[in-house]
Amino acid sequence: ASDVYKRQMYGDPLPEIVQERLDRELNSIISNGYAVMYIIAQKLVWKSNEDGYLVGSRGSVGSSFVATMSGITEVNPLHAHYLCKHCQYSDFDSDLVKSFSGRSGCDMPDKLCPRCGKPLSKEGFDIPFETFLGFKGNKEPDIDLNFSGEYQSKAHKYTEVIFGEGQTFKAGTIGTLADKTAFGYVKNYYEERGVHKRNCEIDRIVLGCVGVRRTTGQHPGGIVVLPMGEQIYTFTPVQHPANDMTVDITTTHFDYHSIDHNLLKLDILGHDDPTMIRMLQDLTGVDPTQIPLDDKAVMSLFQDTSALGITPDDLVNCQLGALGIPEFGTDFAMGMLIDTQPKEFSDLVRIAGLSHGTDVWLGNAQTLIQEKKATISTAICTRDDIMIYLISMGLDSEESFKIMENVRKGIVAKGKCDKWPEWKQDMIDHNVPDWYIWSCEKIKYMFPKAHAAAYVMMAWRIAYCKVFYPLAYYAAYFSIRATAFSYELMCQGKEKLEGYMHEYEKRKDELSKKEQDTYKDMRLVQEMYARGFEFLPLDIYKSEPHHFQIVDGKLLPALNTIDGLGDNAAVAIAEAAKDGIFLSKDDFRERTKVSKTTIELMSDLGLFGDMPESNQLSLFDFGA
């Protein structure tokens, strides 16, 4: 199927550059025995797509063109090129295309196919395969996939269909004692026995306790696969998480890191982006895979607020339209956007790399950009940048790969790389600038470019809907990503909301975690109001348990936005409402099992209208 797909896309015979990349990758994948991982990942992704959910790739699997052609990842790692999907014309080596080396194909200007006159597709992110498997296939690959949180459990179940019942197990985790907990245990032990110990002795005993197993759990997405004909007990005991026999889940007893060299582990993780994109597709009818990655209005969200039709004065402490966009909506990320002034998709990929690394931006790239020693284009943003740049400066490719691996894992920064003095001298001998070497010595962890590209593609699609389908965007965001939405605080109009925001601002250093989350949601609600959109009053008969709805050009809030009303209670109200109207508040409480306090709050918010307190009629009701 992959062979048919690639020839449908690139033509038959394949362009030389495509054939060469496929041959090089396949040789490395097959000779090292990794083909089975690709086939499993392909089956899982195809099944999810068939059921209506996109899958995002994590990590460096997007570096593999074989993964792209297998449908495992949407990231095309070839260098920027034009492609006609009607007649298979391709352009890999015109001067214009070559000028986009190291950048994303989607940033190239629009062109028509010289052969058939149709608009050309702009492809490629220029990512080397070696980031995934190394130059000799000697790096163990890891195919991590982001499934919709709503679909994750189905994907886990589907592994049983692929391998058979009893062949897959949830990966176990081991929770160990942390410093503070161990200190508490030791201190309490001696206090309870009336024994006085010096602090240095307590510290000595604490050191012996730190790291000791405390409990067991399960990895959020790890599935361990057993080879046919083997028993799991050959490799590890199995158990229920935290030894809870009532739980219907079996995990490996050993931490999966202890056995992942002996057994295949699949990372089937849950993520909000695919869920949100599915909801946006349902609300708008727009196919997310057809959203252009070069729309100027969408790009402007990362520069100012003009595409939203508002000014920064309409918002509290926000100069951009990036609020609520995955990867870019935090104050930290927006500060980076203001500092770096992105102009194209490639810049966003680089910024995503900077923002997710450790000691890559603060005290590193930010300083270099401020001192005009580097730009967003020349600073080290993703791990691939190091290898590509060093090879371009004339260093040996295998050595460049090893330098990249040691820098991106923080081994160099921690002073634990014995080869670093030799490599550093080699870099100096090849005229690598001092600032570049200084930057390498600071980095503690780096993202792969493929991961950054995959995440930015998802974020861009959501940003596109924010510009062109605002109500659908806000409905999806408040349904899926908002963590502390409050009907009482946010849906009573712009003035009331801003009053609450002002109150939160005054004590911003004292806000609890829940209040911080509430304030984060308030900012997006304020933006929605500024764009001229409103909420309808919540309706106990029409509102859905968890999802906001678009009704008559306004948003109808979900039931679970009422403070104190949990997800289960919201479902109970929706189910009870299907059985007919509530005769009274007593009837409502009886049928929904909602607490008295919550009913009083709902009553104060006017959600019951003129509903009587009880089913009993008074003589005064007849006299009315």
Language model features with spans:
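Noncatalytic, beta-rich nucleic-acid-contacting surfaces in large DNA/RNA-processing enzymes
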Residues: 2-624
